[in-house]
């Protein structure tokens, strides 16, 4: 059962034993090494200011989509799709950070220099919601929040080298 600890979920044990599926057993066959992420935003200018101008994600373009407009940014092979709907939804992200509700609560960007990154972000006025923390041996994280209250985690994994 997951437990909250300093705003992080820690899994002590899983109630099942997983086995690797044979290739023919896999239902989802992936065609690239990452997933893309769609984020519905209330203010596309503020969201672009955060993700493109402050975090430095690469601009890919914008296009009309049914019900709104999509702004596409690259993060490695991942595409972050900011979606501004014609009608802004009333629902907001649950308060309380990653332990504040169910569902997608944050996404992670792996970085080579978490201290340098956080210093640059703080110089731009972005305050961490979780300061630089060793989550487990060899794994250091920090988190920030976008203008709509969505959490972005930065992760440095030195144990994988």
Residue ranges of model-derived segments:
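Acidic, Ala/Val/Gly-enriched low-complexity intrinsically disordered segments
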Residues: 4-6, 17-22
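Intrinsic-disorder-associated, low-complexity terminal segments enriched in Asp/Asn/His/Tyr and depleted
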Residues: 11-12
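Vicinal oxygen chelate
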Residues: 23-35, 58-108, 118-145, 157-161
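Short hydrophobic/aromatic beta-strand micro-patches
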Residues: 40, 108-110
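Conserved active-site tyrosine of GNAT-family acetyltransferases
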Residues: 47-52, 121, 149
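Short glycine-/small-residue motifs
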Residues: 154
